[in-house]
A protein has these predicted regions:
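Functionally important transmembrane alpha-helices
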Residues: 372-435
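Juxtamembrane helix-loop-helix connectors linking adjacent transmembrane helices
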Residues: 18-19, 193, 224-251, 264-348
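Short, amphipathic, aromatic/basic-enriched membrane-interface segments that mark the entry/exit
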Residues: 347-348, 361-369, 384-389
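Short juxtamembrane and helix-loop transition motifs at transmembrane-helix boundaries
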Residues: 336-339, 351-361, 377-384
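Alpha-helical membrane-inserting segments
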Residues: 221-230, 253, 257-261, 265, ...
């Protein structure tokens, strides 16, 4: 308990991914604007996406902006003091230093000099930075629009469109399904839930599983022993690959102790009491129905989770403490790194967490305290285990939704599918808006 309280408190000092995500979305909007139909531009990119990007950049402390973002700020702003401040910090990327000097010494002009035009051919400049810097150095909008960058604008418009329409569409479908389910439940038109079967463990045994295996051994002891080795072996890999390998190996290391303890606990139970489908009630067949149940559960849980996150933002703002993996995905441009991060988030995390929280914790607590308390407490433990106080309320709602799916289907596989769908949707959105 002390470890979780300390970790939750410490999560407040971690940066939130929200500002970085907002910046990426605004950058995509500026780049995509020329390729969007005029009727869609105000909806997808805003009336003045460049002004919105500048506003978003100014909301982030300069020391949290990377080299490229500070140059974007200097190129966009018309305030000399803001430009000087943005260009004052030294750059870590040497290839961008000529552009930094050009923006720092540029005088107000209506023409782009030949020297500046040559400077903008630097391959280190991406299409958006090249275009905005060109305009800041005196080039006209037409002259600064590079035909070779047209494909980048079209690609950005497609990613922006998908990143906005996909969650909105899923949210609307979820609202319809949720209202339909509530209506049918009120009319008593839904079938009764099956009996809740699970391991015949005691609350003390699941405390040993979670506190001893998950927290102490998996969260404290093994990371202290393994993390230095992982860091030495893989941290120097390019493009975030070392971080992705570290995340994957760290997650596997964290999962091993509780799974070993769980196997020992289940092995000690009498064989003649094992229910059909096993202690964890995987019930893999029919797998097609499990996919449908999991996908439907994901759509139905989205409205309450999104509403909870929105309400938290309105009441307390953004407290920070996002999962560091989110920003890794957002900034990574290494395909193999993204594959490893996806394997961790979309495959390993749903499998391990559903085994522990919906396969064991929920049935034991529901048998000891009743289904209502079992749903709430298993969801609370699930939320706290993510060690992010800012994301705790939405994760609590998500955990309760997963618990209700386990109760309504009597199977664990749909919960894994639902959890994987949630993580995959988040992952996809980050890739669409990321590097």
């Amino acid at each position: 308990m002390t470890y979780w309280v300390w970790s939750l408190t410490a999560s407040l000092s971690r940066d939130s991914v929200a500002p970085a995500l907002s910046l990426q979305q605004q950058e995509k909007a500026v780049l995509a604007a020329p390729a969007l139909p005029p009727s869609l531009q105000p909806v997808l990119a805003g009336v003045d996406p460049s002004e919105q990007l500048l506003k978003t950049l100014l909301e982030v402390p300069l020391d949290r902006l990377d080299d490229r973002q500070r140059l974007l700020l200097a190129a966009l702003t018309r305030d000399q003091a803001e430009r000087v401040a943005a260009l004052a910090l030294p750059l870590e990327t040497q290839d961008l230093e000529p552009l930094q000097r050009a923006l720092a010494t540029a005088e107000p002009s209506t023409t782009l000099s030949d020297a500046h035009e040559q400077l903008l051919q630097n391959p280190a400049l991406d299409p958006l930075l090249r275009q905005l810097s060109c305009e800041a150095l005196g080039g006209s909008r037409d002259r600064c629009t590079n035909p070779e960058d047209a494909d980048a604008a079209v690609g950005a418009s497609q990613r922006l469109l998908l990143a906005q329409l996909f969650p909105i569409g899923a949210l609307l479908i979820g609202v319809v399904l949720l209202l339909r389910d509530l209506w049918m439940r009120w009319r008593r038109a839904l079938p009764a839930w099956p009996p809740l079967l699970g391991p015949l463990l005691s609350p003390v045994e699941i405390t040993i599983l979670v506190a001893g295996g998950f927290v102490l051994l998996g969260g404290v002891v093994l990371p202290v022993l393994v993390s230095p080795v992982i860091e030495v072996l893989f941290l120097g890999q390019p493009g975030g690959l070392g971080q992705a390998i570290g995340v994957l190996l760290s997650y596997i290391t964290m999962a091993i102790p509780p799974l070993v303890i769980l196997r020992s606990q289940l092995g000690a139970l009498p064989d003649d009491n094992v229910p059909d489908g096993g202690w964890l009630q995987w019930r893999l067949q029919p797998w097609g129905r499990a996919l449908l149940q999991g996908g439907r559960g994901w759509l139905m849980v989205m409205p309450p989770v999104v509403f909870t996150g929105w309400l938290m933002g309105r009441l307390v703002g953004d407290p920070g403490g996002s999962n560091p993996l989110l920003e890794m995905v957002l900034r990574s441009d290494n395909p193999l790194a993204l594959v490893l991060l996806a394997l961790t988030a979309v495959v390993l995390a749903p499998l391990f967490e559903e085994v522990v929280f919906r396969g064991v914790v929920l049935p034991v607590l529901a048998r000891a305290l009743g289904r209502g308390w079992g749903v709430f407490l298993s969801g609370l433990v699930f939320a706290v285990a993510h060690l992010s106080i800012g994301e705790l309320p939405p994760l609590l709602v998500l955990g309760m939704g997963l618990a209700l799916l386990r109760l309504s289907t009597g199977r664990l596989l749909p919960c894994v599918v639902m959890h994987a769908c949630w993580n995959a949707a988040t992952f996809l959105n980050l890739i669409l808006l990321g590097s």
